[in-house]
């Protein structure tokens, strides 16, 4: 079965547009002087939120986060245990 060239072009265009959209605010801090400070504040807030979530007494939440963020480990464990 042959995949149409238009599908390849669409996938590449969507991938590039998504990566450019995500990278634009951080790509050129000279264009927006507050972009670097905003990115640093966002990174610090994210780090604090992760630290607070991991410090909670419920041990299931970090395990659930691990399974959600790294699905191949979940698949491996389910294959071995199941």
From Swiss-Prot:
Its main location: secreted. Keywords: Amidation, Ion channel impairing toxin, Neurotoxin, Secreted, Signal, Toxin, Voltage-gated sodium channel impairing toxin. One of its GO terms (cellular component) is extracellular region. Residues 1-23 form the signal peptide. Residues 24-59 form a propeptide. It is found in: Secreted. The modification Leucine amide is found at residue 81. Transmembrane segments: none annotated. GO terms for molecular function: sodium channel regulator activity; toxin activity. The keyword Cell inner membrane does not apply. Belongs to the formicidae venom clade 1 family. Negative results: does not exhibit hemolytic and cytotoxic activities on HEK293 cells. This is Myrmicitoxin(1)-Pm3a. The lineage of its organism: Eukaryota, Metazoa, Ecdysozoa, Arthropoda, Hexapoda.
